[in-house]
């Protein structure tokens, strides 16, 4: 677990991000404005914090951050931190240009996240030099560590291996959530050893762990959380057959969770379980009750 998760970066050893991190959904009420249901959010986090997770990510892709106002994002962070009861909470921050992202990051830093999870700028497709400049400026300014987020199918910008290795030299850039879809790039960053690599693609957790990744930030960790935690433990203890069996057992659930755009299927499952309302904010659309029920049945078979 991260120690002193909201204090400025020190010159000591870097904190470990090993383990399973839950990128918590943002529950919405079934009302006219689809307001954030902070009570349901608190209850969810309190439930997951007892299941062996390393911590939480607030306002990531799974948390529908793009649909939240700046104030809602700050309130979500406060709620998750309160419910996490000492477990570290990483905060997602994203955008298309440096100045507004930097301003938002510094405002959110006042709410004491453990770290920031930051993807490449979206939509504008910057050069690799531009990506280095962007992350360097944010890492220079951040009072807490930065985790890179390579997810080109959402941002439109891939962070090349050479760029990641250049950014690894920054003392305030500690790791990466890897959704890059490039096994060679993943292995190069792991072999370099300076960035802690966390799987971000749910179906690739086992492979990333076996290659030397330290953990995962995955939407599927909402479902049978303890089995993902056990998978990490099994790989750490060199019980690869046990970890492989868990991977194959969870694979059908993972496929259903991404049968429609995340977090639609996940919210449908959580709604079927009575945890949240099956409500997303436009332009995201709720997944069908049938998909939610299929997930309930698939989870029941694990």
Stretches with model-predicted labels:
Residues 2, 11-30, 34-156, 166:
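Active-site beta->alpha loop and helix N-cap motifs at the rims of alpha/beta catalytic domains
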Residues 2-3, 8-10, 16-29, 47, ...:
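C-terminal alpha-helical cap/extension of soluble enzyme domains
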Residues 18, 54, 59-62, 91-94, ...:
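Short glycine-rich loop/turn motifs that provide flexible caps or phosphate-binding loops at active sites
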Residues 24, 65-68, 97, 180, ...:
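Basic, gly/Ser/Thr/Pro-rich low-complexity segments located predominantly at protein N termini
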Residues 38, 70, 161, 237-240, ...:
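Alpha-helix N-capping/helix-start residues
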Residues 41, 73, 77, 101, ...:
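A general structural signal for well-ordered alpha-helical segments in protein cores
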Residues 140-141, 152-258:
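Catalytic alpha/beta core domains of metabolic enzymes, predominantly
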């Amino acid at each position: 677990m991260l120690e002193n998760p909201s204090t400025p970066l020190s010159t000591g050893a870097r904190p470990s991000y090993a383990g399973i991190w839950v990128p918590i959904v943002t529950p919405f009420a079934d009302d006219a404005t689809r307001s954030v249901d902070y009570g349901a959010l608190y209850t969810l986090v309190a439930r997951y914090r007892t299941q062996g997770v390393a911590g939480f990510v607030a306002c990531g892709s799974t948390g529908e951050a793009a649909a939240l106002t700046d104030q809602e994002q700050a309130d979500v962070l406060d709620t998750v931190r309160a419910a996490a009861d000492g477990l570290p909470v990483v905060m997602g921050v994203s955008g298309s240009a440096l100045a507004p992202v930097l301003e938002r990051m510094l405002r959110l830093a006042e709410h004491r996240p453990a770290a920031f999870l930051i993807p490449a700028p979206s939509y504008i497709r910057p050069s690799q030099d531009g990506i280095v400049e962007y992350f360097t400026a944010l890492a220079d300014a951040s009072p807490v560590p930065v985790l890179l987020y390579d997810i080109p199918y959402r941002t439109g910008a891939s962070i090349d291996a050479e760029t990641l290795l250049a950014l690894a030299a920054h003392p305030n850039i500690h790791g990466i959530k890897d959704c890059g879809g490039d096994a060679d790039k993943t292995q190069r960053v792991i072999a370099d050893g300076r960035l802690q690599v966390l799987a971000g693609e749910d179906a690739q957790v086992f492979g990333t762990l076996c290659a030397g990744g330290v953990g995962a930030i995955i939407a599927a960790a909402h479902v049978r959380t303890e089995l993902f935690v056990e998978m990490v433990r099994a790989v750490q203890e060199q019980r690869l057959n046990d970890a492989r069996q868990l991977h194959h057992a969870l694979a059908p659930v993972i496929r259903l969770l991404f049968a429609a755009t995340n977090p639609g299927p996940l919210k449908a499952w959580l709604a079927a379980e009575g945890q949240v309302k099956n409500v997303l904010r436009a332009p995201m659309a709720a997944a069908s009750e049938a998909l939610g029920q299929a997930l309930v049945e698939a989870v029941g078979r694990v």
